[in-house]
């Protein structure tokens, strides 16, 4: 069993960020905490893709995943997987949600019958409900939100809590905040509960091709952004022309963070950059940054 708390692991992983202007100590998340994991299936085999390969390694337990996911993995792996596709397994606050995406448009009756025997909240196939025993729920503080099939969540609860606290602290003193690429509201509800006048965007607005314009941004003195791996180049281009005084940028891709940071530096100074190891056992990092 690999020790993800070892000095060797941490030294090797942090070395991948050697060229970044990091201002604070890295935050390390333990293994066994992932609440969402992407699996693959093909030719009846369910598991993870082998590194740099299209071959699938069968999986019935994952030391990186939380106990709730590992409890159902053997049964999920044993489903009659026809065709090929991807499976997102998510541990919601009240149980497990399974979202299948596949080029095969419809699930078989055999798959439906087998899925009905799983101890899960819901199984969907290309967004169509196969089985639903209850509505999946995720909580952000005191707020309970219905979880749509395949929706984004921070990969770990502890990581989400840490980032949320960092965002609230970095926004201190601001009055009106915009939470862009807000997803289900990991930061939105926390900022609202802390007394900020907060608006969320990104659920229905394509911020990649239709970013908030300067006129829209000028209503706010703080902007929070947590874009997907592609980053937020269009939105950053608008921000540097605006009157927004503070940008809190959370990134899951150091490469696009570097690109976007160069744009933001046309107007702002980098105040802090802290790496968070939410993706234990991989080369990926989460970055928390504040520009002002």
Predicted features along the sequence, with ranges:
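Accessory RNA-recognition modules of RNA-modification enzymes
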Residues: 1-225, 230-237
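Short hydrophobic/aromatic beta-strand or adjacent loop that forms the aromatic wall/cage
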Residues: 36, 284-289
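Short beta-strand element of the conserved SAM-dependent methyltransferase core
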Residues: 100, 288-291
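Active-site beta-strand termini and strand-to-loop segments that position acidic
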Residues: 140, 291-292
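S-adenosylmethionine
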Residues: 206-285
């Amino acid at each position: 069993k690999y020790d993800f708390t070892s000095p060797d692991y941490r030294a090797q992983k942090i070395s991948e960020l050697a060229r970044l202007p990091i201002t604070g100590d890295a935050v390390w998340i333990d293994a066994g905490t992932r609440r969402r994991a992407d699996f693959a299936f093909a030719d009846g085999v369910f598991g993870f893709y082998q590194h740099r390969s299209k071959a699938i390694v069968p999986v019935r337990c994952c030391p990186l995943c939380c106990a709730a996911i590992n409890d159902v993995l053997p049964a999920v792996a044993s489903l009659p997987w026809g065709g090929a596709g991807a499976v997102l397994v998510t541990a919601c606050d009240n149980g497990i949600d399974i979202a299948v995406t596949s080029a095969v448009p419809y699930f078989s009756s055999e798959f439906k019958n087998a899925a009905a025997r799983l101890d899960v909240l819901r199984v969907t196939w290309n967004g169509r409900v196969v089985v639903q025993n209850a509505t999946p729920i995720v909580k952000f503080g005191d707020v309970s939100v219905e979880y749509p099939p395949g929706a984004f969540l921070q990969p770990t609860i502890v990581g989400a809590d840490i980032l949320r606290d960092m965002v609230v602290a970095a926004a201190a003193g601001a009055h009106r905040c915009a939470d862009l690429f807000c997803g289900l509201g990991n930061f939105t509800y926390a900022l609202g509960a802390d007394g900020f006048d907060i608006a969320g965007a990104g659920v229905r607005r394509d911020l990649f091709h239709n970013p908030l314009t300067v006129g829209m941004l000028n209503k706010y003195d703080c902007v929070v952004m947590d874009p997907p791996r592609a980053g937020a180049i269009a939105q950053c281009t608008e921000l540097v022309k605006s009157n927004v005084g503070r940008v809190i940028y959370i990134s899951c891709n150091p490469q696009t963070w570097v690109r976007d940071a160069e744009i933001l530096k046309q107007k702002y100074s980098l105040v802090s950059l802290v790496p968070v190891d939410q993706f234990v056992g991989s080369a990926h990092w989460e970055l928390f940054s504040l520009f002002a």
